[in-house]
Amino acid sequence: RMEKKLTEIFGINHLLPTHQGRACEHIIAQHFVKPDSCVIMNYHFTTSKAHVTRLGGRVEELVKDEGLIVKSNLPFKGNIDLDKVKACIEREGADNIAFLRLEAGTNLIGGQPISYENMKEATELAKSYGITTVLDASLLQDNLYFIKTREDSMKNKTIPEITRMVADLFDMIYFSGRKFGFGRGGGILIRDEKLFHEMEDYVTMFEGFLTYGGMSVKEMEALIIGFEETMDLDIISQGPQFIK
């Protein structure tokens, strides 16, 4: 049921269930990161960076410079700098880029959002070099709200429509259920069936059987309700920071 609901929302058929978000990061890093390889991010989260560096990889944080200016009213301070991304790929070589990870929104700089257009351009650039694209959707519900209210081309789109448009940009999407879904758990959605089967064993080794990945049935059922609520604009616009 959980996989079915996530497929309905994101349009990706293959789910690796985990007990929480950092377990997703562990599995992704185990599969992709090699010594001295590079992971490009708009901004890191503590565990996302730690899993990369633990395996001998490096993190390149390429959020736009203006994203770090505290006293500004820029609408999307989580945007990645596309010129820096291209320069990094050219310098490192595409084969040495483990993956591109975009975080929507950027937890450690105040949850600043990233625009749909920036995600689209960044993933297109990465894919032109054959680089896997990964979305950290843990804080996606807030980012969806900001895309709808701040991005002119999205004002007439529904939250489910925006979510699917964002999802269509990425090869993989992972999340912490405590944030996206309002419950305990996590998961990795993988678009490519071959890659999904290559990564299945990590769940069995580190999390549990593929049917639950360390979550109880109670937790999975609660997350299903949370996923539905995340698609409701009335619910995701209720944070105190959104009240004017």
Each model region followed by its residue ranges:
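Conserved PLP-enzyme active-site core in the AAT-like
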Residues: 2-244
